[in-house]
């Protein structure tokens, strides 16, 4: 058994309710066309080459949930290649519905833990990264499983271009305190809270944001820039 808190093996559910016929069909037929194969330890990937039309820049979303945010970003920015990482099959299926309905050609998916993909990407290859409403892992003994973690931030700092943006949002008070503390302490990121409550203009909404508001938990929205090399 591993003792490494940042071991990339997934902790949590991979599947929820049984998929409907359309969703299962998209998993069977569309996902294989969009999926990024898991790289080996020594593999290196050119993210620009993953797309049929070379994008102006590449953005990454880690844990895209139901895919509302990722699909909206991809639709609004057709010149950008958007990579989404998600392990939950039902969330992947929801995103595939958006991709199919919007005929998005600039989306690629990694249906595994993002930490298995990131080491294979080259330095300064991402313009933006999004971590929207991640699993808060509220128990203290599980805090090392949180994606926003010093070691993961080291990796993201390597991947982001100078002044590249990392957006993180959460409605969990414990996670908010954690992410603000960890990000503020990291020497290669500069930024902070953009809004506590209302979603910033131009940031697409998600089902998790809507649920947070319904349940009386105002989200905190943060933006961080990669300090120049």
What role is predicted for each listed range?
Residues 1-60, 68-75:
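S-adenosyl-L-methionine
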Residues 57-116:
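SAM cofactor-binding core of SAM-dependent methyltransferases
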Residues 119-128, 133:
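A short acidic, Gly/Pro-enriched loop at the edge of an enzyme's catalytic core
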Residues 129, 156-157, 166, 179:
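Class I S-adenosylmethionine-dependent transferase superfamily signal
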Residues 139-147:
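Glycine/threonine-rich flexible loop motifs
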Residues 148-162:
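A short glycine-rich, Lys/Arg-flanked "PGG" loop and its adjoining helix->strand segment in the class I
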Residues 162-170:
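Conserved beta-strand signature within the Rossmann-like core of class I S-adenosyl-L-methionine
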Residues 175-177, 181-229:
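Class I S-adenosyl-L-methionine
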């Amino acid at each position: 058994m591993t003792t490494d808190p940042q071991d990339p093996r997934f902790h949590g559910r991979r599947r929820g309710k049984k998929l409907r016929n359309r969703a299962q069909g998209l998993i069977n037929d569309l996902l294989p066309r969009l999926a990024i194969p898991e790289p080996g330890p020594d593999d290196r990937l050119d993210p620009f080459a993953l797309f049929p039309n070379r994008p102006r820049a590449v953005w990454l979303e880690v844990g895209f949930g139901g895919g509302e945010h990722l699909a909206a970003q991809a639709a609004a920015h057709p010149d950008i290649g958007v990579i989404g990482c998600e392990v939950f099959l039902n969330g992947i299926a929801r995103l595939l519905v958006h991709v199919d309905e919007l005929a998005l050609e600039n989306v690629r998916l990694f249906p595994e833990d993002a930490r298995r993909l990131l080491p294979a990407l080259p330095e300064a290859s991402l313009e933006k990264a999004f971590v929207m409403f991640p699993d808060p892992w509220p128990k203290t003994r599980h805090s090392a499983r949180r994606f926003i973690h010093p070691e993961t931030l080291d990796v993201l700092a390597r991947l982001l271009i100078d002044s590249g943006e990392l957006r993180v949002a959460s409605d969990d008070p414990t996670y908010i305190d954690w992410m603000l503390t960890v990000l503020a302490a990291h020497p290669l990121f500069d930024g902070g809270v953009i809004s506590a409550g209302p979603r910033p203009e131009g940031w697409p909404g998600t089902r998790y944001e809507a649920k947070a508001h319904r349940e009386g938990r105002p989200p905190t929205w943060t933006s961080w820039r990669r300090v120049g090399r």
